[in-house]
């Protein structure tokens, strides 16, 4: 039987995926610890992604964004 797994990837930093696994056949106490730990780790990953996004936005200039061109029908 497979483990319960969650993978979370940051769009701005795909080199550091986050993976959390819980073995099948766990005790109820382990489930609570698992979800508390999972929540903390996902929050940490979201914070990391937000920091990466902020850095990316600060370094991008007007010339880095392609110009919008009208669609001609």
Swiss-Prot record:
Any GO CC annotation of this UniProt entry: chromosome, telomeric region
Subcellular location: Nucleus; Chromosome, Telomere
Parts forming coiled coils: none
GO biological processes: tRNA threonylcarbamoyladenosine modification
Keywords, in A-Z order: Activator, Chromosome, Nucleus, Telomere, Transcription, Transcription regulation, tRNA processing
Keyword S-adenosyl-L-methionine: no
Domain of life of the organism encoding this protein: Eukaryota
Predominant location category: nucleus
Keyword Nucleotidyltransferase listed: no
Function of the protein: Component of the EKC/KEOPS complex that is required for the formation of a threonylcarbamoyl group on adenosine at position 37 (t(6)A37) in tRNAs that read codons beginning with adenine. The complex is probably involved in the transfer of the threonylcarbamoyl moiety of threonylcarbamoyl-AMP (TC-AMP) to the N6 group of A37. Gon7 likely plays a supporting role to the catalytic subunit pgp2 in the complex. The EKC/KEOPS complex also promotes both telomere uncapping and telomere elongation. The complex is required for efficient recruitment of transcriptional coactivators.
The protein's assembly and partners: Component of the EKC/KEOPS complex composed of at least SPAP27G11.07c/BUD32, cgi121, gon7, pgp2 and SPAC4H3.13/PCC1; the whole complex dimerizes.
Family listed: Belongs to the GON7 family.
Protein known as: EKC/KEOPS complex subunit gon7
Organism of derivation: Schizosaccharomyces pombe (strain 972 / ATCC 24843)
């Amino acid at each position: 039987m497979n483990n319960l797994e969650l993978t979370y990837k940051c769009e701005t930093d795909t080199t550091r995926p986050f993976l959390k696994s819980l073995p099948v056949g766990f005790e109820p106490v382990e489930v609570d610890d698992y979800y508390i730990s999972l929540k903390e780790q996902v929050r940490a990953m979201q914070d990391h992604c937000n920091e990466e996004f902020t850095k990316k936005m600060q370094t991008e200039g007007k010339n880095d964004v392609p110009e919008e061109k009208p669609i001609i029908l």
